[in-house]
Amino acid sequence: MLGRCKRIRIGYPGGCTIGARPVDLHLDAMKKMGVLIRETEGEICGECPEGLSGAHIHFPISSVGATENALLAGVTARGETLLENCALEPEIMHLCHFLQAMGAEIRGIGTRKIWMRRAAALRDVEYTIPTDRIVAGTCLYAAAATRGHIGLKDVDPQEMKSVLRVYEKMGGQWEMRSGTLRANAAGIRFPVEQVCTMPYPGFPTDMQSILMSVLLTVPGESRIEERIFEKRFQIVEELRKMGGRITVTGRQAVVCGGRKLTGTTVCARELRGGAALVVAGLSAQGESVVKHAEYIERGYERPDQLFGQLGAVIRIREQVEE
């Protein structure tokens, strides 16, 4: 927006209440590119009358969103831009390839250091968005929770390496055949000694609560350490309503699995936690109701149809205000 309009006025970003998500890295990057930032109550105003200028930006903390914002700004800025300590998530690489297709000159794709220079003009292109690795991982783990078989088309196992590694540790088997990842969860029965969420290529924080639902179906004691967002464990209270035995100490959760969950009414408080409650409901005895499905719909298009392809019977109905 700044590259095109030279002026913005936006509300502070919201999103899921999973922990601190400051925007200082974004604002600092824009300031280095010549943007005058003014923060008022509930709003961020920015302007660059002469347009954006290329800059050397070093992120003190690796951030997916800040890297993406700086990339988008950099391809419209005068001169050259160098980003250091960039996030390594596959989504960054895909964004770079998209911008390259539009005519931007970018080097260092897939590394911590990305260099770019503005093209004379960005052109229209047709671009196919790759498969969402977190949605694919959710489907894989949903089948794991019910010990089912699943085929996932057009997924990149390299992007899901950490998720598949945990799947294997639990006893699941998978293979790539004719462009489809085929997985068999019939052998899942082993607890996981320790899983720590980490930036890519580590185990994704977005899969943590979904894994927790799966581990409740596995006999024995498993441990999860959440190193990214401090409020990811708010799902624990809801899983306990279904009979889940989970103990939380700080950023570590101990999951005692093997006891059959019981369907009940639970409440989604954020996107991935909501998906995890659906996964728990699929493995539970009886019917489960997940309130505030709008959280889930933010990240899963038509979740009733998505999980329906796995054999689940899911209906989404409008929630009546209490």
Regions found by a protein language model. Give the residues of each.
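Structural preference for solvent-exposed beta-strand-turn elements
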Residues: 1-322
